[in-house]
Amino acid sequence: MEPPQCVEELEDDVFQPEDGEPGTQPGSLLSADLFAQSQLDCPLSRLQLFPLTHCCGPGLRPVSQEDKATQTLSPASPSQGVMLPCGVTEEPQRLFYGNAGYRLPLPASFPAGSALGEQPPEGQFLQHRAEVQIARKLQCIADQFHRLHMQQHQQNRDRAWRQVFLFLQNLALNRRENREGVGPW
């Protein structure tokens, strides 16, 4: 099973330690090849919480493969009967819309008078970039949690409808036994 194209294109400083840091050995769990493994080898995919592509943002996927569950629904969606998690009365506001996470504004610490061609001090740039990548990963985790919660809610609802259907089927097929009180009791 080939890893998805987006895993090969991923440039992620958060999971690529500097030379000499622990975890830079080839067999280490912190090595940069962690997310380039097959889905069976990926330690996070074994938890069934993160697919292999959990580290890929929406901008790295082709539009045909983009995960629609991470997109915000239109404001008219509550009138269309969209399910929300238990106890939630309104749809949560997304931090990023579509590919907007890749077009973040300049950090507040960026000097306003400097030209865009100038680079901020190296430490600030790397810190800001790491924060953005962590925010993307947290957003991805939150989306996955919401998806799993909605899936569980749907399964519970399907189970309840199945029980109602079986009750009505039993009632219709066993009319004589139900009328005469004949049964296993």
UniProtKB/Swiss-Prot annotation:
Span of the annotated motif BH3: 134-148
Bias-annotated ranges (Acidic residues): 8-21
Pfam families: BMF
Region feature (Interaction with DLC2): 67-75
Residue span of region Disordered: 1-28
InterPro entries registered for this protein in UniProt: BMF
Translocase listed as a keyword: no
GO biological process, one term: negative regulation of apoptotic signaling pathway
Entry keyword set: Apoptosis
Domain of life according to the entry: Eukaryota
Record has Transmembrane helix as a keyword: no
Quaternary structure and interacting proteins, as annotated: Interacts with MCL1, BCL2, BCL2L1/BCL-Xl, BCL2A1 and BCL2L2/BCL-w. Interacts with the myosin V actin motor complex through its binding to DLC2.
Family: Belongs to the Bcl-2 family.
Function: May play a role in apoptosis.
Full protein name: Bcl-2-modifying factor
